[in-house]
From Swiss-Prot:
Signal sequence annotation: none
One Pfam family matching this protein: Abhydrolase_1
GO cellular component: membrane
The enzyme's E.C. designation: 3.-.-.-
Single GO molecular function: hydrolase activity
AB hydrolase-1 domain mapped to chain residues: 20-133
Keywords tagged on the record: Hydrolase
Enzyme class, UniProt record, top EC level: hydrolase
Family: Belongs to the AB hydrolase superfamily.
Name of the molecule in the record: Uncharacterized hydrolase SAS2467
Amino acid sequence: METLELQGAKLRYHQVGQGPVLIFIPGANGTGDIFLPLAEQLKDHFTVVAVDRRDYGESELTEPLPDSASNPDSDYRVKRDAQDIAELAKSLSDEPVYILGSIVAMHVLKDYPEVVKKIAFHEPPINTFLPDSTYWKDKNDDIVHQILTEGLEKGMKTFGETLNIAPIDAKMMSQPADTEEGRIEQYKRTMFWSEFEIRQYTHSDITLDDFTKYSDKITLLNGTDSRGSFPQDVNFYINKETSIPIVDIPGGHLGYIQKPEGFADVLLNMWG
């Protein structure tokens, strides 16, 4: 893996291929290895970069997180993630880059539009700008409380039911790692995401105006196998309010690992 030293962290990332830079930003998984099958499909067309977000996988903190980062309304981590991606983009290319992601990608576009050539938001589970935002914020508060008091298994079951996660995704999300060490790491990673990201990222400061001013750069992606899920509803709402196009892409919420060949074909039709 490659390394970029940043304030407070060593950011590590996979890099394969040649051509214009395309950065993949992981969501709850946190690590870029989930994108490697997709990267193999695209490496003849792009320099594909798959990041381990700070404090996930091989990326390591060199300074501790501020105590406030676990506060439900803290934007420290999502803003820091966005800054990391912007600094990575600038280190890799003198030109704006392509980006695929979700909520972090939205903050990259909002705060660092100069690094973005084209960007795709794949099923972002954000609620801030929705008419029923308070309802979803309260639901996420309840889910995190349940995880922290009743256990991860029960809380994640509620999470899947509340967001109407598709069976193809629920099966993959619940699949344990192959080794005991892997299962321990998986548990730690999910607990970290629960405490520091479920509430903070999904209710972070993004508005529809943040999209309309850069609408020519944005594509919304919804999976063909995750119809009816909450993240898809978010994209439908963005589309209704801004007319930013939605493109169907193979697979579910984790389509890039479920159906990488078809997923790559859609990206190439968009950007190739």
